[in-house]
From Swiss-Prot:
SMART domains linked to this entry: Zpr1
Designated name of the protein: Zinc finger protein ZPR1
Lineage of the species this protein comes from: Eukaryota, Metazoa, Ecdysozoa, Arthropoda, Hexapoda
Organism: Drosophila melanogaster
A GO-annotated cellular component: nucleus
Phenotype caused by lack of the gene: RNAi-mediated knockdown in tracheal cells results in defective gas-filling lumen in terminal branches.
């Protein structure tokens, strides 16, 4: 095994006693030296010895992956694939793409081994773990299907001519699919939650792309190697008495628990504290500082349950004072700026206690590191740069905007600049609304039985 590195690099070789200066998984950057690992491996075509090159990297706006490229100098066989190196997500992901033009075929697709793909219009279904994970495009998925069906067609025409003719007709349907004479749908479902389809309109919402999350079944968890513990087994930890830790004592207590750094995966400590937000409710504030790479995160989670109604805040931002409002954004809250056609989903930014300016800075920083900065498409890069310039004008108060925060769980709060109820805040509008069926489905409330649950359904 060998590591390909820059011979002119002045960095000393890494030893066992040295702390790694940078995380293993880094975003692709032309100015950084790629740490490519080469491994000798057997060629599956001629069974001679070839070379596999491994590159651990981080896809912006997505997760950590290992890119693998195999080449055999004996027969010329080449194979490329991608393995997910990130943790299995809490929920599975389901992505629906409506392909309406040839340009949609160029959308990037990141799919793991645990993903399945289907195109209902032609009754195509690629089951889970039938193909290796890869970074490809919508057209690449169709091309790979055509290549797979075309294998052994010559032999099949001799041995089973009827089957070969049927497959040939299906291959012709796949070729016609690439012409996009009629719209069709691509459904991508990944039980590990580690798949992704590009949104070329980002940061604006894409009307052709719909993303939803689902809770895995026990069978799907076992398929990923996740097994539930038998709660009937004897536990090593002794149970805590009901009144051992009164809630009043937790308000002045900073609790710590071990975790891993989300940037470099090094072990670190997370501090957690229960606190009260004036004029609102009880929340849990968590902060993590990594001693290895210096990465800092903070997150806020609601200390209460789901409210009876959802809440929608509209904040007009026109002065420096408007940027200083305190904001408690829960993890179920989505944000939008109608003037910029910008929408940020609830999972893009975690729950946090900050200010309006802090929210805008977090949105800008996340957009500034998106997938489009290393894109070969100059038009896409210019489009993103123009949007970032416009966003900078908003930060400098050169444009008046309205920030909309919508939380179906009702656990988000925006500070009012007026303490007198008789003089309402003209720049802040608060609206309570009844949740839709889809909102309750996302919150897991439709399957929750709160009355008569002791009775058999």
């Amino acid at each position: 095994m060998s590591t390909v590195s820059d011979p002119n690099s002045s960095n000393p070789p890494e030893s066992a006693g040295n702390i790694r200066p940078e995380p293993i998984f880094r975003e692709i950057n032309a100015e950084q030296t790629d740490e490519i690992v080469e491994v000798e491996s057997a060629c599956m075509n001629c069974f001679e010895t070839g070379v596999t090159r491994l590159l651990p990297t981080k896809i912006p706006f997505f997760r950590e992956v290992v890119l693998m490229s195999f080449k055999c100098d004996h027969c010329g066989h080449i194979n490329n694939e991608m393995q997910s190196a990130s943790e299995i997500q809490k929920s599975g992901i389901r992505i629906e793409l409506r392909v309406q033009s040839v340009a949609d075929l160029n959308r990037r697709v990141v799919r793991s081994d645990n993903s399945s793909i289907s195109i209902p219009e032609i009754e195509l279904e690629i089951p889970v773990q039938s193909q290796k994970g890869e970074v490809t495009t919508v057209e690449g998925i169709i091309e790979r299907t055509i290549a797979g069906l075309s294998q052994d067609q010559e032999k099949r025409r001799i041995d089973h001519p009827e089957t070969a003719a049927s497959i040939e007709k299906y291959i012709e349907r796949l070729h016609r699919l690439k012409e996009v004479t009629t719209p069709f749908q691509v459904l991508l479902e990944d039980i590990s939650g580690n798949s992704f389809i590009e949104n070329p309109l980002a940061p604006a919402a894409d009307p052709q792309l719909k993303t939803s999350y689902f809770t895995r079944s026990q069978q799907q968890n076992e398929q990923l190697g996740l097994y539930e513990q038998n709660h009937e087994e004897q536990h090593l930890l002794k149970p805590i008495a009901e009144d051992s830790w009164p809630i009043e004592n937790l308000h002045g207590e900073v609790l710590q628990f071990p975790t891993n750094c989300p940037s470099c995966q090094a072990p670190c400590e997370t501090n957690m504290k229960l606190t009260n937000i004036p004029h609102f409710k009880e929340v849990v504030i968590m902060a993590t500082v990594c001693g290895a790479c210096g990465h800092k995160t903070n997150e806020v989670k609601s200390g209460g349950g789901v409210e009876a109604q959802g809440v929608r805040f509209r904040v007009q931002i026109a002065s420096r004072e408007d940027l200083t409002r305190d904001v408690l954004k829960s993890e179920t809250c989505s944000m939008s700026i109608p003037e910029l056609d910008l929408e940020v989903g609830p999972h893009a930014l975690c729950g946090r206690f900050t200010t309006v300016e802090g929210l805008l800075v977090a949105m800008r920083d996340q957009l500034d590191g998106t997938l489009f900065h290393d894109s070969a498409d100059d038009a896409t890069k210019q489009q993103m740069q123009r949007f970032l310039d416009t966003f900078e004008d908003v930060m400098n108060l050169k444009r008046v905007i309205t920030l909309v925060l919508e939380d179906p769980a009702g656990n988000t709060y925006v500070q009012s600049l007026s303490d007198d109820d008789s003089e309402p805040d003209d720049k802040l509008t608060v609206e309570r609304y009844d949740r839709s069926y889809e909102d309750n489905e996302d919150l897991g409330l439709n399957d929750m039985k709160t009355e008569g649950y002791e009775e058999k359904a």
